[in-house]
């Protein structure tokens, strides 16, 4: 389906209710950022109303300028040394069983922010024994030593998004590469982690390219895959090529499952952390974290 008015299947729930207001208050009181807000996630209303949010660490200014992403780009401020404790406190106040953490890319830092990542994971775990921690990290410019700092903090699920097909990596993810993303996922898998990745539809990809991307993710052992519709944040971002219909998302889900990816969340409004807790239950993550 070529681009025209946004179809009815992309209508999202508007933010409202006591759960939404509580999350907003906790985030504001702890001077934190969420990718829900920064990336203009269409599911913010639904997730916040359920009392969940994806907390974004290392500030809200990214050193990269990906043409699909709404997160602000520029020169980040100095590191906030109090951030790990405040994130841990926010997780406690939200009473989360499954915590999703992400960050901007910090290519200005030698380790890409890996030490901060490790400190946040450990602080959340110390303050919230039994919480399952899912991380959605940048690629640390392919530096496996930095990646290992994060993995050594022992998150329960490691997520790193492929985002799009190989041909579109350079125009869409200027500072990332297809092979580097697969290498990061492969390294996490080699260390025994449950791994997760995601791709978007509607940004200019072809059908055979989607299939190849899913096969490549399966080859590096990805356990969980998310597939969602690309939504253009502003007119200056990459244009929407088409609106993929719900039945296409269902078809790609069936394909991914058929080649060995164990859990697939696929639909127009699906984003990386959408229904993350439910996905992780397939792997007994919550039970293992609370043991």
Language-model segments: what does each one mean?
Residues 1-54, 89, 93-95, 119-131, ...:
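Auxiliary Fe-S-binding modules of radical SAM enzymes
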Residues 67, 170, 208:
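Alpha-helical elements of the RecA-like P-loop NTPase motor core of helicases
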Residues 65, 109, 168, 235, ...:
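Glycine/Thr-rich phosphate-binding loops of Rossmann-like dinucleotide-binding domains
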Residues 70-86, 93-144, 150-184, 196-200, ...:
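Core AdoMet radical
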Residues 60, 138-141, 204, 269:
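Short, surface-exposed acidic/glycine-rich loop or hinge patches that mediate macromolecular interfaces
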């Amino acid at each position: 389906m070529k681009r025209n008015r946004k179809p009815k299947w992309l209508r999202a729930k508007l933010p409202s209710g006591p759960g939404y207001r509580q999350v907003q208050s906790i985030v504001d009181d702890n001077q934190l950022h969420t990718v829900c807000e920064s990336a203009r996630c269409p599911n913010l209303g639904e997730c916040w109303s359920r009392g969940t949010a994806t907390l974004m660490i290392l500030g809200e200014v990214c050193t990269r300028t990906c043409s699909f992403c709404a997160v602000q780009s520029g020169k980040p401020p100095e590191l906030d040394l109090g951030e790990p404790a405040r994130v841990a406190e926010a997780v406690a106040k939200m009473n989360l069983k499954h915590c999703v953490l992400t960050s901007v890319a910090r290519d200005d830092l030698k380790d890409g922010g890996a030490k901060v990542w490790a400190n946040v994971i450990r602080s959340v775990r110390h303050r919230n024994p039994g919480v399952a921690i899912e991380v959605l990290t940048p690629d640390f410019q392919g530096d496996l030593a930095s990646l290992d700092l994060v993995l050594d903090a022992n998150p329960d699920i490691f997520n790193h998004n492929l985002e799009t097909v190989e041909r579109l990596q350079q125009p869409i993810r200027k500072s990332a590469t297809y092979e580097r993303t697969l290498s990061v996922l492969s390294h996490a898998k080699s260390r025994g982690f449950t791994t997760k990745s995601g791709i978007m539809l509607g940004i200019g990809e072809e059908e055979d390219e989607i299939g190849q991307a899913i096969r490549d993710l399966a080859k590096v052992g990805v356990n969980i895959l998310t597939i969602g519709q690309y939504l253009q944040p502003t007119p200056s971002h990459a244009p929407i090529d088409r609106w993929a219909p719900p039945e296409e998302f269902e078809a790609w889900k069936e394909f991914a499952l058929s080649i060995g990816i164990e859990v697939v969340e696929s639909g127009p409004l699906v984003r990386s952390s959408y229904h993350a807790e439910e996905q992780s239950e397939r792997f007994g993550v919550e039970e293992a974290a609370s043991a």
